């Protein structure tokens, strides 16, 4: 049996409005927060989004959103989606491999225990978090 998870179609459309490089953490976070809001507005998942960027250049590698409910998959959190897409795109499971740029994960909310574990295993060098608290737990 195969397992296939797909991000919503609107993401590609929205990404076309953004530059390839987002130079500041503020710009990266602004984009991720925008995607988290759109995910709720479009009804394609919960209010969570994440992005993988090259740490020093701000090059956007991937964006993921929460698709737990539409995919019937409890592990389809935004962080997992963003990391998985980046790993497939770069054709490597270790985003901290020698010889490649350092990567960071930008998230709109504090990761859960599962996602935090995935962050550690992914090899990203930095985790940038917009907020935390009971409001979205």
Residue ranges and their predicted role:
Residues 41-44, 93:
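Surface-exposed helix-capping loop/turn segments at secondary-structure junctions
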Residues 1-41, 101, 111, 117-137:
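Zinc-dependent deaminase
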